[in-house]
Amino acid sequence: YKFINAGNQHLIIETKKVFSYDLDNLSSKVRRRKFFKNVNISLFTKLPKKLELRTNEAGAGETLSCGSASAATASFNIIDKSSIKIISAGGELSLRKINDKLEMIGPAEFICEGIWLKN
């Protein structure tokens, strides 16, 4: 596993089958520890030329995609390559290393709308 600060904190765990784990249950157990209370937790699987990624964001639960988790995961998997694809439930992102920065390219879609209720 890796612990990375990408503007927010991420615990990134490599697994053989990213979709075979109960991510909500795992995240709940990890966050019981004081140090990991507000950490985003991601699982990833390495595939040829791409990574599969699932993320449980602190305070939100599992999300379709997470840009900071994608960047955090790519940051230590892109070392010998100039770019990598990340596949999540929300779609595909391409991340490219340019000098010491990461460029993220992918679609954005409107998926829902809500109303803020005041007490």
Summary of predicted features, one role per range:
Residues 1-64, 72-119:
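Active-site proximal loop and beta-alpha junction motif in alpha/beta enzyme cores
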